[in-house]
């Protein structure tokens, strides 16, 4: 069982049962990845910019959530929300250029090209102290 609680009051906010359906979850995530990979780069950039805008619009609510759930000081929580929004915005603005294929000048070779393709879902154990930053980066 996963429990979230407010460290300032000791009250339990939410409880989540553990799941035995790891294969089902990974299947769903893989479907999402397949859809995302097929999405045009310009559309992906637009989505990232929309996420940045949503973080800006809901900054107080997002900051309050991590203040309540993990005891992060309000100023630090606001700073993390702003940082995450800036990361989404940066990738929305610069990401398409980063994904452009590169041609390398290699002596004796006809063509050397570097392409950037998504490889698949990532499962990770993340530190708890920067939840929005961990996802944005």
Regions found by a protein language model. Name each.
Residues 49-136:
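N-terminal Rossmann NAD(P)-binding subdomain characteristic of aldehyde/semialdehyde dehydrogenases
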Residues 1-68, 90, 97:
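Short, structured beta/alpha segment
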Residues 20, 24, 117, 137:
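Conserved active-site and cofactor/substrate-binding residues in soluble primary-metabolism enzymes
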